[in-house]
Amino acid sequence: TNAAGEHLDYTYHYNQLTDIACSVYPENNVHYEYGTSADASINAVGKVILQEDASGWQHFRYGKLGEVTVNFRTYTPPYESKAFTIPMAFEYDSWNRIQKIIYPDGEKVSYDYNLGGMLKRVTGEKDGDTYKYIEEIRYNPFEQKEAVFYGNGTRAYYNYDVLLRLSHLQSICADGVMQDIDYDYDEVSNINFIENHAGTLPNTLGGTYRSDYTYDNLYRLTYAVGNWHGNNTLYYETSLEYEKNGRISRKVLYTDTWLNGVFSGSHFDNRYHYDTTYQPNTVRMIDGSHNHAMDWDAKGNLLLHHNGYAGYDRRMCWDEQNRLQGVVDYGQQLSYYQYDAGGERTYKFTGEYTAQNQSGQWHYFYRLDKSTLYASPYIVSNEKGYTKHYYAESERIASRIGGGGLQELDKGMGNEPDKFDNHKERANHLLERTADCLEVSVQPMWDVLSYLYEWQEIKEEEKDCYW
């Protein structure tokens, strides 16, 4: 039972968890089924073979070392009448290293390793065609990346100091040098400065930049200053003050921007006020150039964010496990989320609201007409199409897009329709294009940057969860 009086009920069969019941949002209930002696052929005796949660069902098959080799996920969207099954298959070696991933559309991605057991190459194969995602990774004697040669011709080179900290990174694409970055550290490995020497590329993207950082005796960031010179020019300067207990008490920011020869500048001086009773670490008000007011629930989740500068409220709803269930932006949109049993987001529904006046009273109606399915770290789909993500260990190295959305991805479970030929051609085109620089994004060290690739969404409704 949490501070709001919400509770979860757990049911066991001996030592096996079989059910999780939620007191407020029963649609988030979870059910597990385990393998018996009859499931020995898929190495599932005593292991979870079926998981039922808010997103749908998952069926599992296992290898001899207990690794998941097949995962069938059937999704049941609450606002749609159809269900979608998306399988993924995995192959491992005797060291439990991933050898192959088979995507729902039939593409087989293989992982090769060097004699030291480190990842060396990542390639894909589909319909007889081969795609190189990573041609080669080279390592230094300390097993740190020294050079990465990507399949689209992009190259990255890494250098380290005597303490094995990254000291220099150079990235080269077809247009030239994208990054030529130096890193400098203090005695306790805080970053002193980051400086990029690579200039503007022929397509006007990129540019040189530098940021310097200063810390107090407790290694907290107190001052940062930086600039960027490219097709346009940007300068910023920020300072932070802290209370004795470590809470931020003040933040000052100056920015100067020259865009297309036009100068603009901004400045804010914000002071943070905290709850002095039951939640001493929750910000109740930020006053200054931009006034904000916040309200929190008993569990410490943000319920209301009043933006005095923009003039609107944002309201949030959370479930028993402190997962964001919904966001309402008055005058903008409603977003609703679903999660699987592991707490991973699987669905996002969004839509705009409409207002009607009946007999002098306003009535508000919301329509959730857009959806995004996060099938796994490897597949993201919406009504326009789907994106496949590729990884080298925990690092995402490439993305490819396909058309047709969930329906077409679901059809790919059987005979592949003609649309996958179009997907293949488009993917080749993107891989060729990504050898050229399409996008350059630079953010302060303390900021959080979402994916900005043109085929990957940016979750705007969550952007101000960070200050």
Predicted region positions:
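Short, solvent-exposed loop/turn segments at conserved positions within beta-propeller repeat blades
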Residues: 206-207
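Long hydrophobic segments that form regular secondary structure
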Residues: 296, 300-302
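Short secondary-structure transition motifs
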Residues: 9-34, 178, 235-286, 316-467
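A residue-level detector for well-ordered beta-strand positions
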Residues: 8-10, 32, 60, 90, ...
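Short, acidic, Ser/Thr-enriched surface-loop or helix-capping motifs
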Residues: 2, 12, 43, 63, ...
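Short loop/turn segments immediately following beta-strands, especially the blade-tip
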Residues: 37-40
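Beta-turn initiation residues at beta-strand->coil junctions
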Residues: 1-5, 13, 19-26, 49-60, ...
